[in-house]
């Protein structure tokens, strides 16, 4: 119990989080530029969520001794993991209902006007694919289904670490 509570005050777990997210970002770029799979708008949003998790890991690794840095890292990790899970679940639902008349997939990301990431970093955030298209499977799971697993794991680990940290911090 105490180990989990103190895990975020050391650098290694934060580096592991950053490396896991970096691996996922690099995998996304591999799928896009080597295998030729065009990312859809939901893929772009999921990339942004992974980028938030990567940022959490990097900030936590650099500032693991600083409470403000750790709080910022927790916030980015939680937001990235939970928002990513929600987006991935929506993406799976879109793929399930892609033949429906009510199915719609935007082509321009809904980023704030002050941060048009798809214009600033198009190689990473430009959506050129169709959300309903399933062009890749692994063990009969589509990419969004695998991302549900990934984000669920990130969310579960986040919840366990955060709850443990809060419970142990309250003990005298």
Curated annotation (Swiss-Prot):
Q: Quick one: a GO cellular component term?
A: plasma membrane
Q: What GO molecular-function term can you cite, just one?
A: protein-disulfide reductase activity
Task: Supply the name of the protein.
Answer: Disulfide bond formation protein B
Q: Which SUPFAM superfamilies match?
A: DsbB-like (SSF158442)
- What is the originating organism of this protein? Colwellia psychrerythraea (strain 34H / ATCC BAA-681)
UniProt keyword list? Cell inner membrane, Cell membrane, Chaperone, Disulfide bond, Electron transport, Membrane, Oxidoreductase, Redox-active center, Transmembrane, Transmembrane helix, Transport
The role this protein plays is:
Required for disulfide bond formation in some periplasmic proteins. Acts by oxidizing the DsbA protein.
- Say yes or no: keyword Transmembrane present: yes
């Amino acid at each position: 119990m105490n180990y989990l509570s103190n895990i975020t005050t050391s650098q290694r777990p934060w580096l592991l989080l950053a490396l896991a997210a970096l691996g996922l970002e690099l995998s996304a770029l591999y799928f896009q530029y080597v295998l030729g799979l065009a990312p859809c708008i939901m893929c772009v949003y999921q990339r942004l969520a992974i980028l938030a998790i990567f940022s959490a890991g990097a900030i936590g690794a650099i500032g693991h001794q600083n409470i403000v840095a750790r709080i910022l890292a927790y916030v980015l990790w939680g937001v990235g993991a939970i928002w990513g899970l929600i987006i991935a679940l929506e993406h799976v639902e879109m793929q399930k209902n892609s033949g429906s008349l009510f199915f719609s997939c935007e082509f321009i990301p809904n980023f704030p006007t002050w941060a048009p990431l798809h214009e600033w970093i198009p190689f990473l955030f430009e959506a050129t694919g169709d959300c309903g298209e399933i062009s890749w499977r692994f063990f009969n799971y589509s990419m969004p289904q695998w991302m549900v697993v990934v984000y669920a794991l990130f969310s579960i680990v986040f919840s366990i670490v955060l709850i443990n940290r809060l419970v142990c911090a309250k003990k005298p």
